[in-house]
From Swiss-Prot:
Family assignment from sequence similarity: Belongs to the profilin family.
GO cellular component, one term: cell cortex
Protein species of origin: Phleum pratense
Name under which the protein is recorded: Profilin-4
GO molecular function terms noted in the UniProt entry: actin monomer binding
Length: 131
């Protein structure tokens, strides 16, 4: 299966009538492997900050997490594995695998729990595949 198929079929899938606003699979260096049409372009320093937070959980909490200049308040995730952010009525979930970052961005009416489920399910699958 291509990386684009993972985004189209597993991240942008319908959950209880709702979809993520955008999604992508990135390399740890920020290289885009596949993305949905509306996915924002990360700046290199944003990826650096995200990777540092995986290595040093809590690094982003004081400043927030920036994604294409949009600021997300970092909320409880899983240290070293998942970063979650909130911005207004939406948010972001980032799951780290051995080689990739699986990213989902949502807006209402999708819930944070639905976004977490979609992103983390694919991330867990990729981890089991050694990716």
């Amino acid at each position: 299966m291509s990386w684009q198929a993972y985004v189209d079929e597993h991240l942008m899938c319908e959950i209880e009538g709702h979809h993520l606003a955008s999604a992508a699979i990135l390399g740890h260096d920020g290289t885009v492997w596949a993305q949905s049409a509306d996915f924002p372009q990360f700046k290199p320093e944003e990826i650096t900050g995200i990777m540092k937070d995986f290595d040093e959980p809590g690094h982003l909490a004081p400043t927030g997490m920036f994604v294409a200049t949009a600021k997300y308040m970092v909320i409880q995730g899983e240290p070293g594995a998942v970063i979650r952010g909130k911005k207004g009525a939406g948010g972001i979930t980032i799951k780290k695998t051995g080689q990739a970052l699986v990213v989902g961005i949502y807006d209402e009416p999708m819930t944070p729990g639905q976004c977490n489920m979609v992103v983390e399910r694919l991330g867990d699958y990729l981890l089991k595949q050694g990716l």
